[in-house]
Amino acid sequence: MRPALAVGLVFAGCCSNVIFLELLARKHPGCGNIVTFAQFLFIAVEGFLFEADLGRKPPAIPIRYYAIMVTMFFTVSVVNNYALNLNIAMPLHMIFRSGSLIANMILGIIILKKRYSIFKYTSIALVSVGIFICTFMSAKQVTSQSSLSENDGFQAFVWWLLGIGALTFALLMSARMGIFQETLYKRFGKHSKEALFYNHALPLPGFVFLASDIYDHAVLFNKSELYEIPVIGVTLPIMWFYLLMNIITQYVCIRGVFILTTECASLTVTLVVTLRKFVSLIFSILYFQNPFTLWHWLGTLFVFIGTLMYTEVWNNLGTTKSEPQKDSKKN
């Protein structure tokens, strides 16, 4: 029952989270900082109450290690959300972030001196080609959909390039953080709930540097049209409602992934998260009518197949199917 519940939470929470993020970004493209701050604050308060026991429970992993992890996590979160300000469409944002396998492999080879099979290199090549196709086609759309002025078109393209650079940086930084986490968990044991709390609580002072931008968007949110929440009948500006739902769904998504990691094998977790991204992408294209050509679909297919190849889903499904047959023969 718990694995089924976890899968339901991941799909319901993560997919709806993307929807509310796009609703926010479409109305105010520069709202990434206030969204990040709200998410961090909510998870930090929840963790302080239920995980840290109001600060009475000492951390299993020393704070100095969390400080390093938090610096990376804060940077990745802010840069990823800020990329939406730089002419990056939500579908491309999702596809590009699916390239985490590439970043993990590159840094794994460089830092951990890992070696992989030809099968895994092939899968990464597919993911790389898929992301390149989607990125290249999005670049053509940015220049063609810009203003008729040639200067405006060039300026939009430059901002788009900065967005791609930001996403690439965040991708590599996220992979480096994953390697750092892996070494910490090997040394101190797995404490994922504790890590979740400290990763969101310790960066909160850093938002002081973004306070002006957060305040400006809070004022803009206050000026949005009023919306009456069904059932409870409370009325509030619709942008605050979108933000509230984004926070709640983000929490549901994170909790779902956490339950999934404790109940299922890592292969299952990867497969569920990959399928969730694919569903979110399709919904974003169909519901929000984001421009998506045949080339984009081809690139997405390459990314999806490459990810499944990397996790060796087919091989593992074959072994799991053969195991019951062996058991039945023995009986």
Swiss-Prot record:
Q: Which GO terms describe its cellular component?
A: endoplasmic reticulum; endoplasmic reticulum membrane; Golgi membrane
- Where is this chain's protein located in or outside the cell? Endoplasmic reticulum membrane
Keywords of the record, alphabetical order, are: Endoplasmic reticulum, Membrane, Sugar transport, Transmembrane, Transmembrane helix, Transport
Domain of life (superkingdom): Eukaryota
Example GO BP: UDP-N-acetylglucosamine transmembrane transport
According to Swiss-Prot or TrEMBL, what is its membrane topology? Multi-pass membrane protein
Q: Which InterPro entries match?
A: SCL35B1-4/HUT1
Residue ranges for motif Mediates endoplasmic reticulum retention? 326-331
Single GO MF descriptor:
UDP-N-acetylglucosamine transmembrane transporter activity
Ranges annotated as spanning the membrane: 4-24, 30-50, 59-79, 92-112, 117-137, 153-173, 201-221, 229-249, 251-267, 268-288, 291-311
Signal peptide, first to last residue: none
Q: What is its main location?
A: endoplasmic reticulum
Q: What job does this protein perform? A: Antiporter that transports nucleotide sugars across the endoplasmic reticulum (ER) membrane in exchange for another nucleotide sugar. May couple UDP-alpha-D-glucuronate (UDP-GlcA) or UDP-alpha-D-xylose (UDP-Xyl) efflux to UDP-alpha-D-glucuronate (UDP-GlcA) influx into the ER lumen, which in turn stimulates glucuronidation and excretion of endobiotics and xenobiotics.
Family under the similarity heading: Belongs to the nucleotide-sugar transporter family. SLC35B subfamily.
Q: What name goes with this protein?
A: Nucleotide sugar transporter SLC35B4
Which species is listed as the source? Answer: Homo sapiens
